[in-house]
A protein has these predicted regions:
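Accessory terminal and edge-of-domain segments that mediate assembly/interaction
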Residues: 1-446
Length: 446
């Protein structure tokens, strides 16, 4: 038996768990059928009994798998591959799930601890508690990832860009064989490989970031959500990404960048942040990835409303300014920006294609994701209660990572860097350029 700790909230965890078991059962049946059809079970038993049996891909090919299949199986199970296959051959995917909640408030306690850590980090960064921020200090909440926002704002990349490109040329890095619309997109993509090999560079990147007011909270309090705090006043005249624009001398705004939350967890995360920073919140920005019901991978979706799949609750969003959408289109050479309602599902795997067609053609839905409704519900409630200003800007943008309506679509298929990096950084630059411009203009008009 296995004991699992569900760290998120209720249904999202259970849907993920059951979905994973279903996927395992389907794939296990395929493997078992292959072993039976090719009479490979006796060969498998013989290999397990031998002390000198071949291992890895060689053993997989003896069982009848082709070269690509053998490579993938060894990639999944690099150790004891034959033992894992034997378990699949014998097991019949009969699972019993017993869910027992020892604490009704476990997640709430974790969220409270996580929020207190954000408050403490704000104190250390600014010398003020979140409730003590003066009117000229605006807070911009960004839900994205742990790299694109800080990459665009960290001056380390401007100084070390030539060194990274030279390193890539020496190794004939595959990202150099692709044509990029923005050279810095290639730089950020290559940097991931560079940091894996040059460990000192990753430490140097973080150190330079700290010198320019970028702080990372690695302790997630069991929420799985990292946080980065960015004091824009320390980035005055620093060399940030060329497409963002300079941070003005009077800009005192801060950015609270949080890693992706999933499902209902998003509702609790954003509520706690809005309560923490209150009327200081100038904008809430969501940069996510989604499955699209039109277009292609690498496009961008700008929702006009969210539809909650479980209740079919329809929640219209404030209209995005035309300048924002046009700015995104200008940054997305070769890809499109699609507007329309988006479906918030409890899980994006094992979706019913017939129902997705229903949402596409009846509701004119452009995409499917997992957090939008939960985020927006709390933002709307906080605005109506006066916790945050009604003037706070909302920005929701998603880049397309998969196409669930395509017959041969594979939700687990990895986005190649040249597919995923350009839309990710196009959205990041658009959001950051607007945040920086608002902070600059706000202080000039103060």
């Amino acid at each position: 038996g296995k004991n699992l700790v569900l760290l998120r909230i209720g249904d999202s965890d259970l849907v993920d768990l059951v979905t994973t078991l279903c996927l395992y059962a389907v794939e296990a049946q395929k493997i078992r059928r292959r072993l039976l059809q090719q009479d490979s079970i006796p060969v498998l038993q013989s290999l397990l009994e031998r002390d000198d049996a071949p291992e890895g891909e060689e053993a997989m090919e003896l069982l009848g798998f082709d070269e690509d299949e053998a490579r993938q199986l060894v990639k999944i199970w690099p150790d004891h591959t034959l033992v894992r296959l034997n378990e699949i051959a014998r097991h019949r995917e009969m699972f019993t799930i017993d869910v027992r909640r020892q604490r009704q408030n476990y997640s709430n306690r974790r969220m409270s601890l996580w929020t207190s850590q954000v408050a403490d980090a704000t104190r250390h960064l600014l010398g003020l508690a979140p409730s003590e921020l003066p009117p000229e200090v605006g807070v911009h909440i960004v839900s994205s990832n742990t790299h694109s926002v800080t990459n665009c704002l960290n001056p380390w990349f401007r100084v070390n860009g030539p060194k990274i490109r030279a390193w890539a040329r020496e190794r004939d890095h595959p990202d150099l064989r692709v044509e990029w619309n923005f050279d810095d997109d290639a730089l950020y993509s290559i940097a991931r490989s560079y940091f894996k090999e040059e460990k000192f560079a990753a430490r140097e990147l973080e150190q330079v970031g700290r010198e320019y007011g970028i702080r990372r909270l690695r302790d997630t309090a069991s929420t799985g959500i990292e946080v980065q705090l960015i004091d824009l006043s320390q980035l005055t005249d620093a060399e940030v990404d060329r497409e963002i624009g300079a941070v003005g001398k009077q800009n005192r705004d801060i950015i609270v960048n949080i890693d992706y939350a999933f499902g209902e967890q998003a509702e609790h995360i954003i509520r706690n942040l809005l309560m923490l920073f209150g009327r200081s919140v100038r904008s809430v920005n969501f940069l996510g990835k989604a499955g699209a019901l039109l277009g292609r991978r690498g496009d961008v979706l700008a929702p006009t409303a969210f539809i909650e799949q479980s209740t079919e609750l329809f929640q219209p969003l404030p209209e995005q300014p035309k300048e924002s959408l046009q700015g995104l289109r200008d940054r997305l050479e070769g890809n499109e920006v699609h507007t329309g309602p988006m479906l918030t599902a409890e899980g994006t795997l094992l979706q019913n294609r017939l129902m997705l067609n229903f949402y596409r053609h009846i509701w004119q839905t452009v995409g499917i994701e997992m957090e939008g409704t939960h985020y927006y519900r709390q933002i709307l409630e906080s605005s109506q209660l006066g916790v945050v200003s009604e003037e706070a800007r909302l920005r929701f943008f998603y880049y397309v990572s998969d196409k669930p309506l395509e017959t041969k679509a594979n939700l687990s298929a990895r986005l190649e860097p040249h597919e995923g990096v350009p839309p990710l950084y196009a959205i990041t630059r658009q959001i950051l350029s607007e945040i920086v411009a608002e902070g600059n203009n706000g202080q000039e008009n103060a």
